[in-house]
């Protein structure tokens, strides 16, 4: 499976955010899309996901998909967690094959003991990001796209989250966006200017 981004451009309020961006995302690839704030990182992911249209260029989905439709495991800049539910319930609700107990076990890989049973509104911002990462990784996906997944994390939380992501990659391509200096220690780096 390959996602081909060809000469994608996007303007906001007359300002170019993306200009002729081309990127090949193939099975097993890991790409850190690095850029300053307002460089178009989020717009690029949203275009790949089909949530926004490019002004110019195209995104092509090539090859065979593992599932009936193109599935994306995503971490957005906003948490998109369901308030009133525990961390484990938020993880379990995205995959009907995952029980709340299995979600708790997965969350224990990143969160302090007992945290999985807390309502998500009682978690720290970094802990909520970790719930989002696990939720994106537990969904059967053709690709995983993560928009600044480590925002607000301490170095220890970031390293733990990176190790978790690395442990579950297999052949599913991963694209993350990050600020300069925050790229993954594995895979390749693509700079937006």
Q: Where are the predicted features?
A:
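Conserved structural motif at the start of ABC-family nucleotide-binding domains
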Residues: 3, 18-20
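Helix-to-loop junction immediately C-terminal to a conserved catalytic motif
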Residues: 49
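Conserved ABC transporter NBD signature motif
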Residues: 57-68
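Q-loop/switch helix immediately C-terminal to the Walker
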Residues: 85-102
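Conserved ABC ATPase "signature" region
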Residues: 100-115
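Conserved ABC ATPase signature
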Residues: 119-123, 127
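Hydrophobic anchor residue at the start of the ABC signature
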Residues: 133
């Amino acid at each position: 499976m390959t996602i081909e981004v060809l000469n994608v451009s996007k303007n906001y309020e007359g300002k170019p955010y993306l200009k002729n961006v081309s990127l090949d995302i193939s099975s097993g690839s890991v790409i850190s899309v690095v850029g300053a704030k307002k460089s178009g990182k989020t717009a690029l992911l949203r275009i790949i996901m089909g949530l926004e249209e490019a002004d110019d260029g195209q995104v092509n989905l090539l090859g065979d998909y593992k599932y009936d439709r193109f599935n994306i495991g995503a971490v957005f800049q906003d948490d998109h967690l369901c308030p009133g539910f525990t961390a484990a319930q938020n993880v379990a609700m995205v995959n009907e094959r995952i029980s709340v107990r299995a979600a708790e076990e997965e969350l224990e890989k990143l969160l302090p003991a007992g945290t999985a049973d807390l309502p998500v509104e009682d978690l720290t911002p970094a802990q909520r990001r970790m719930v989002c990462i696990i939720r994106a990784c537990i969904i059967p996906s053709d690709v995983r796209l993560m928009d600044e997944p480590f925002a607000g994390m301490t170095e220890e939380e970031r390293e733990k989250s990176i190790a978790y992501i690395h442990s579950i990659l297999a052949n599913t391509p991963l694209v993350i966006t990050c600020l300069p200096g925050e790229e993954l220690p594995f895979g390749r780096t693509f700079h937006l200017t």
